[in-house]
Amino acid sequence: MSEHTIAHSITLPPGYTLALIPPEPEAGWEMLEWRHSDLTTVAEPVTFGSAPTPSPSMVEETNGVGPEGKFLPLTISPLLHKTSRKALTPTPSLSPLTSLACPNSGIGPRERSTSTPIPSAGTSSTLTQRVLQSLRAPSASTRRSLTASSSSPSTQR
């Protein structure tokens, strides 16, 4: 059997999926696999890595998110077909020119651009200033929506 069995699959934003994969039938839940596919250019999903997960009950409680609501840090690796300790070693699967970057990693394919340079440190755009102001002083409607959507007061600022 070269294909792994996905016992539970959770749908995330377009192009992202999350799957819990049992490495051995008797071993229980051990792996959390993130996959991302660029729907416009890549036919096969690109795996961003696998990492040990907490117990299944903890994963269910956090809806697929790591402890304390944080996503697990993962590295780029090929799609894992047979889960073993050796399979956790990341190896590049795409050429540098066609590789995709992990979300929020800051690393990815470089493209030549004719756009204007980024302003030097110490200057900021009006848009950035407006965003910062809106984050500092949320409106009454924002506070209401935070209160309505949050069950713990620690998420309100």
From Swiss-Prot:
**Where is composition skewed (Low complexity) in this entry?**
88-100, 134-157
Q: Where is the composition biased (Polar residues)?
A: 114-132
Q: Where is this region: Disordered?
A: 46-70, 83-157
Q: What protein name does the entry list?
A: Protein p17
Q: What is the lineage of its organism?
A: Viruses, Riboviria, Orthornavirae, Kitrinoviricota, Alsuviricetes
Quick one: which gene encodes this? p17
